[in-house]
Design a protein with these regions (language model features):
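C-terminal motif of bacterial Sec signal peptides marking the signal peptidase cleavage site
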Residues: 22-26
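Transition segment at domain starts
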Residues: 28-70, 145
């Protein structure tokens, strides 16, 4: 005769074990920002782009913004492609000749975010990258938009 209580216990143990294994296999280890190889990560995550007028990558280890500038960018339509990893969001404030022209954000989950920007006239183009969710790694490039 079957002992239902031991059969139920065994079935419950199998279900708990299966759920734990599924949960562990679905988890991804968090990125260790301090040890991250940013150039290797950037090569994997951000598609190569010819004709970039501005690009940068690096680590945000605190909440201080990182600013990169290109001195003489012609006016026109551009595409800003961004990625970050480490959790939270990274913010990209785009300015042309000292005037903010766009704000963009990327979710720091290893996916790409793309926005179109319009540069009003020839002059310096800068991007201030920041996050309240530091530490994280980021990469971006600005290329002329396809016609």
């Amino acid at each position: 005769m079957l002992n239902f209580s031991s059969t139920r216990r065994r079935a419950g143990l199998v279900a708990i074990t299966a759920a734990a294994l599924l949960g562990v296999s679905g988890c991804q280890a968090p990125v260790n920002i301090e040890d991250a190889d940013v150039p290797a990560w950037k090569e994997k995550i951000l598609p190569a782009a010819s004709g970039a007028v501005l690009e940068d990558s690096g680590k945000i280890l605190n909440r201080n913004p990182l600013v990169k500038e290109s001195p003489n960018v012609p006016g026109g339509s551009y595409t800003l492609t961004m990625a970050c990893d480490g959790g939270g969001k990274a913010y990209f404030a785009v300015s042309s000749s000292g005037i903010k022209i766009a704000d963009a954000a990327a979710a720091c989950n290893g996916s790409l975010d793309v926005v179109k920007i319009k540069v009003p006239g020839t002059g310096p183009l800068s991007i201030s990258t920041s996050s309240v969710d530091a530490p994280l790694i980021f990469a971006y490039h600005v290329v002329p938009a396809a016609a």
